[in-house]
Amino acid sequence: MPGKLSQRIGQRFSDARPNAATYDVHGVVTKVYADDHLLALAVQDFLRPFRGQPDAEPDIEFYLLTKDSGSAGAPSDYFAGAELLYDWQVLRYSREGQLRYQEVPGAGSIVADLDQGIAVAFVDSEIAACTWSVTHVVFFPIWAQLLKTRGIFPVHAAGLERGGKGILFPGKSGCGKSTLSLHLLHNGFRLLGDDTVFVRQAGRGAEMLFFPEEVDVCPETIDLFPTLALARNLADDRWQPKQRVNLNAVKSSKVVEASPADLLVFPVIAADGVTRYERVNQTEALAELILYAFLFMDPQTSKQNFALLAGLVQSVACFRLHMGLDGVALAGTVDEIIAAT
């Protein structure tokens, strides 16, 4: 980390080391340090399935340090001249050489050295108890970019497997990925993730890797699957309006760690309520898939990311699934897609 940063927070690094945990995420080891037990617990819950050996050599080191709201603890003054890559209002993402800078107004900021695999987050103490915000808005975007520089690429998608066939369902928030995943789980499919799936190169195609976080569901989905109410996380969070369900408490035997990506299916909610599917050509599929790649335009990894997604599209059949209201019919249609390839 640059000297101007390390000099300022060197003591904070020492304070954070007692709260340390190691996570082995599909062969990439991340060590997380926190100076607040709530921050440490948030990441622990988020990455619990990947808990690794404490003495493992880390590929990524991530420091979570609290600061008072409005204080000068954040490193934003160091990066006034950084080039803005993204501005999603909730999150701004910039670069300066190999450094990446992320600002989340009202929550904190992060600086990361992609080459060294080090990130330092300055988190407003007021949101330390907001576990979803800490993990998904503060921690995940920069951590995902660090993973990408090490060959693991997150995609905004659901991933499921049946009979050895892996299906990637890319889509934006609200397109029905979680509800689709639950319907398929109840009809014999196995889950890699309902909202985020990791993908890495595997020959000419790609391999899907599980990321079994809590499933984000709306009240209508709870109504469809009443047993989910027993596994809800009732904690309130400013950036997450949906309810969250721990699938391990409902269908723990239905999770699979890895699967070849054999099919690419883009889910949309059918306006007429009738489930059906159609073929999608490769050009259209690639143009749409890129939209669901996290931080795709980061110059550090865009070429490798594009090559991975293009190889995936060229190696599998691509479809669009119009999802109706009947869960059994939905699962049957996905089986038809599998049989058609």
Regions found by a protein language model. Name each.
Residues L180-S181:
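Post-Walker A alpha-helix
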Residues K177:
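Conserved lysine of the Walker
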Residues M1-S173, H186-N187, V197-T341:
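A noncatalytic interaction/capping subdomain that flanks phosphate/NTP-handling catalytic cores
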Residues R190:
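Residue-level detector of anion-binding/catalytic polar loops
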Residues D194:
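Active-site flanking residues adjacent to catalytic metal/cofactor-binding acidic residues
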